[in-house]
């Protein structure tokens, strides 16, 4: 009971703070817009280890968006549909359905969307209640945006027209399945972005958000660094930037433009708050924040949990066969040498009687636990069909 009261008090405090801001905005003829974002979810639907699971992620986002229901939107920063057997077994569709239930307004294409062939991506797009954006993903034989991607979407929130322009990293060309990329090409984002920004402004859009799957980070003074910076140097007229790809928690500004990234696997939610002046016809104030779910009261979406139960049950019955017993934990480190990587490279080298075994370290995604090892444990370590 004490914990319940404490959790309720935290949410009430957040609610009162944002209501106060909204009232202040109304009194001064301002409009408040809240942009919430999740990126690099990688199909982590299930709650386990450090992953909160999408039922909790959905519950927390529902609570946050109640604070400004008419002025909030939820965006996906790419790499959402693949990366676990729970998602991959169904070609990403459980994630699409979950995002529909959560009310996502748009999702940008990340490099890992091409873990799937283009015909599967088209089925994902057909199942989604939101557009999959990718202004710089064009047809291999021309310059038209490739189907099923859209360059942008225009949304209405709190009386304002908001343009969401989607961009993906050029690293897709070297990181995605070459077979699945045959019918598309990835243009440098800065080559096409300004033209679309200008097009949106001509259509009367009042706020423009770059929804990107492009890496960002922060330096010593919290300045924005990373792949996104040279792109922003060549674009003007945007009001907010959502990033992804580098799996970091980022909250800062480039110039006076808020830039956000919310880690990975649903561990966090990004929020950009914009205050738009009706009189000045522009954004006059902006701030950003990353909410780590581990630091917020746990709120579960029970309807989401019920939707997932049969999916998890089917996966467990199919992939929980015990293959071996492991005597020690083999840890993983994506940024350096790791015990699990060393072990499996030895397995490859010895199995093929080779002198050297080479593997994409970024595709090794989990630790091998001690105790019984199942097929699902191995698929958590090597989740991508392309590797």
Describe the residue ranges of each PLM region.
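Short glycine/threonine-rich loop-to-helix capping motif typified by GTGT followed
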Residues: 219-224, 369-375
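C-terminal catalytic subdomain
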Residues: 372-387
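Acidic, metal/ion-coordinating pockets
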Residues: 25-309, 313, 335-351, 357-359
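Bacterial N-terminal signal peptides that target proteins for export
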Residues: 2-11
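A glycine-rich phosphate-binding loop feature that marks nucleotide/adenosyl-phosphate handling sites
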Residues: 289-292, 325-330, 358-368
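Glycine-rich phosphate/diphosphate-binding loops and the adjacent beta-loop-alpha structural elements
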Residues: 319-339
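Bacterial N-terminal signal peptides
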Residues: 11-20
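A general structural motif
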Residues: 189-191, 339, 364-373
């Amino acid at each position: 009971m004490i914990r319940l009261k404490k959790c309720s008090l935290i949410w009430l405090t957040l609610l009162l703070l944002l209501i106060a801001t909204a009232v202040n905005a109304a009194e001064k003829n301002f409009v408040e817009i809240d942009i919430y974002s999740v990126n690099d979810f990688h199909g982590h639907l299930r709650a386990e280890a450090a992953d909160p699971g999408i039922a909790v992620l959905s519950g927390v986002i529902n609570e946050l968006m109640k604070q400004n229901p008419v002025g909030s939107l939820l965006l996906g920063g790419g790499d959402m549909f693949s990366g676990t057997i729970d998602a991959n077994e169904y070609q990403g569709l459980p994630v699409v359905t979950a995002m529909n239930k959560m009310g996502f307004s748009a999702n940008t294409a990340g490099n890992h969307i091409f873990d799937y062939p283009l015909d599967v991506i088209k089925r994902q797009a057909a199942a989604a209640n939101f557009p999959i954006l990718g202004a710089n993903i064009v047809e291999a034989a021309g310059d038209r945006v490739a189907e099923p991607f859209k360059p942008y979407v225009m949304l209405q929130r709190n009386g304002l027209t908001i343009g969401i322009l989607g961009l993906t990293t050029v690293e897709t060309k070297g990181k995605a399945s070459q077979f699945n990329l045959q019918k598309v090409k990835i243009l440098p984002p800065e080559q096409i972005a300004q033209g679309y920004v200008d097009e949106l402004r001509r259509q009367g859009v009042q706020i423009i958000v770059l929804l990107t799957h492009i890496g960002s980070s922060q330096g010593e003074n919290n300045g924005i660094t990373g792949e996104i910076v040279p792109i922003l140097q060549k674009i003007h007229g945007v009001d907010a930037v959502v990033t992804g790809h580098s799996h970091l928690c980022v909250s800062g500004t480039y110039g006076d433009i808020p830039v956000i990234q919310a880690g990975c696997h649903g561990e966090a939610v990004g929020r950009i708050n914009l205050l738009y002046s009706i009189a000045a016809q522009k954004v006059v104030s902006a701030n950003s924040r990353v909410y780590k779910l581990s630091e917020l009261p746990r709120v579960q979406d029970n309807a989401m949990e019920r939707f997932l139960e049969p999916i998890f049950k089917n996966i467990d019955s199919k992939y929980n066969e015990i293959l071996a017993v492991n005597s020690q934990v083999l840890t993983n480190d994506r940024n350096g040498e790791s015990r699990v990587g060393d072990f499996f490279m030895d397995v490859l080298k010895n199995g093929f009687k080779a002198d050297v075994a080479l593997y994409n370290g970024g595709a090794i995604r989990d630790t091998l636990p001690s105790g019984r090892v199942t097929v699902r444990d191995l698929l958590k370590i090597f989740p991508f069909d392309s590797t």
